[in-house]
Amino acid sequence: MPRWTVSDLDQRPELITSALALFAAGPGHDHLVCGTPARMGQPARADDLRRCLGVALLLEGIRPVGALAICPYSESQVTLWGPAVIAGDRLAGARALLGEVRTALDAGGYESIRVLVDTRNRNARAMVLQLGFTAWKDDLLYETALGERPEADLEGIRVASRADHEAVAAILEEGFPDSDHCNPNLVQREDDGYRHYLLVDAGRPVAAAAVQRDGRRAWLKLISVAGQARGRHHGRRLLLGVMASEVRLGATRMGLDVLADNRAAIALYQGCGFVRQWSATIFTGPV
C-alpha cells in the first residue's frame, strides 16, 4: 500500500517552497501549465500558489512528492494546475490527489474541470487521459515584445472610467457570452488588477478590451468589437492602441491565449506582431 497521505497547503504552509518546486519546469516537455491565464508560461512563484483556490499535497512521510492546484475559472468550473507527482506510482498518486480535489469541488458546488497540457509534455497528456479527461481544443499562447513601435493611432481610445463600464461590459459580454469577467462588475475586476480599454468611433462605443499586468508582461484577457461595428478594423486599431498604452505604463511584453480554431483572432494577433510561443491541449471532465 502507498505510504502517502494527502494534505493541503492551507494546513501545511511551511511546505510552500517544496510544493512550488514541483511546478518549476518552464514551457517544454516537463511543463505543467498554470491554470491562471496571466501566469501561463511564466516562472512559477509562491504567490501563484497562494492565489489558487486550494493546493492539495501528496506526502510521503513528511516529504511532498505531489501537488495539484485549483485555479479559478468560472462560477461552475475550475482549471487544475498539475497533477505533479515525482515519486512512486505517479498515476496512483495523481488519482489520490484528484479524488481529494473532486470531493472539495463537489462540496463547493462546482460542476466541471479543465486541465491544460503543454503539447510537448507526453507524460502529462497520457496521465490526464488515464484520469478520465477528454481532449477538447488546443489553446495557443502568443507573445510579442512591445519595445519601440511606430506611433499608434490613439484617437478615440481610452482607459475606461467607471462611467464607461456599462459600455465596456456590453461589448465584452456580447463577444464572450460564456465569460464571467463582467460578474459581478468591472470595479471588482479592476480591484483585482485589470485595466479596461474602450474605443469610441463617431461618438459610439465600438470595441473594448481587458488587460491584466503581471510584472513587465501585460496579458490581454479579452478584446471584442461590437457586433454592428465589425469589419471596419476596429479590433486592430484598439489592439495597437492598447499595446502603445501598456508600453507607456512600463510593460515590455504582451501575451495572450487563443483557441486554435479562432482563425480571425489569430490573424489579428499575428498582424499586430504576436508570435506563437507554445501550445496546450484543453482537457475537460466532470467534478
Regions found by a protein language model. Give the residues of each.
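Conserved donor-binding loop and adjoining core beta-sheet/short helix segment
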Residues: 35-96, 209-221, 226-227
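Conserved acetyl-CoA-binding loop-helix of GNAT-fold acetyltransferases
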Residues: 90-103, 130, 225, 231-244, ...
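Flexible, substrate/cofactor-facing loop regions flanked by secondary structure
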Residues: 36-41, 152-218
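Conserved GNAT acetyl-CoA-binding A-motif
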Residues: 106-118, 247-257
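Conserved acetyl-CoA-binding loop of GNAT-fold acetyltransferases
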Residues: 129-138, 270-279
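A short beta-loop-alpha structural element at the N-terminal edge
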Residues: 1-21, 156-168
